[in-house]
Regions:
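Conserved, structured core segments of small domains
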Residues: 1-97
């Protein structure tokens, strides 16, 4: 099952610094890369303006999505907050098998 997930930056996010210069970036990047490697995060990236991030996630339930994303160090310190998790029926998929 797929979910469209919106995450918002905030809390201790330092808007004067680049993404890769934020506190705890290396740990966050390792965590997110592992979710991609597992096939949990299919696609993801910031939306226009940079405050929100959109992820396409493959998971069994909304609870699974929220539980897994809550393990991120940036979620734990308030830099990222899950704003919405919506079931998504994918009808078009151009990714190669």
């Amino acid at each position: 099952m797929f979910f469209a997930v919106r995450v918002e930056r905030g809390g201790p996010w330092d808007w004067s610094r680049d993404l890769r210069e934020q506190d705890g970036f290396d740990e966050h990047a390792r965590f997110m890369d592992a979710l991609v490697d597992e096939g949990f995060i299919v696609l993801g990236g910031p939306l226009e303006g940079g405050r929100e991030i959109l992820h396409a996630i493959s998971a069994s339930s909304e609870e699974d999505v929220r539980t897994r994303l809550a393990e991120d160090n940036w979620a734990q310190n308030g830099m990222l907050t899950v704003k919405s998790v919506e079931p998504w029926t994918v009808l078009l998929d151009g990714r190669a098998d």
